[in-house]
Amino acid sequence: MNEQVLIKALVEHAYLEGDFVLRSGRRSRYYLDKYRFETVPELLGALGERLAIAVAEHEPEVARLAAPELGAVALAAAASLASQLPFLIVRKEAKGYGTSNRLEGVSESGELVCLIEDVVTSGGAALQAVETVREAGLVCRTAICVVDREEGGSDELARHGVRLWPLFRASDLLGQVKSVVNPHG
């Protein structure tokens, strides 16, 4: 799927207009519903391939991927299959049973990890995941997301030593909204 076709598909499947409160607490007139694009096999596969390519380009020495639950796990799994890199699941909090881990999967201290994210707004969720990964003794200096909403998340991550590489920026998608929502002008 080429870039323009993928952008159009993301807008068709995931772009919603209304009054939304984002995870960051900010209000927005539009919402990119990640579950609407992560649950479509063709889109998930195409995104997994693009994420794998981006990982190879921006963090070629990476040992494994990591993804915060729940939203980015499907993306990390798709990228893992495309890249043949193992991945970790970063829990928001330790579960009260079993291993009680916040980081699920197998890793070795000192390994280089690339964070996979869905939509980044303020960078808060990504930063929490990076902190969990680092507390486990792993190195994380790169995050790759499907969409950067261009609302400060990249700068916030950079302040903590993490470079954000988006597959798309919100402006890429919003430029397609008019033609997709109202194709006849």
Where are these predicted regions, by residue range?
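PRPP-associated nucleotide enzymes
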Residues: 1-116, 120-185
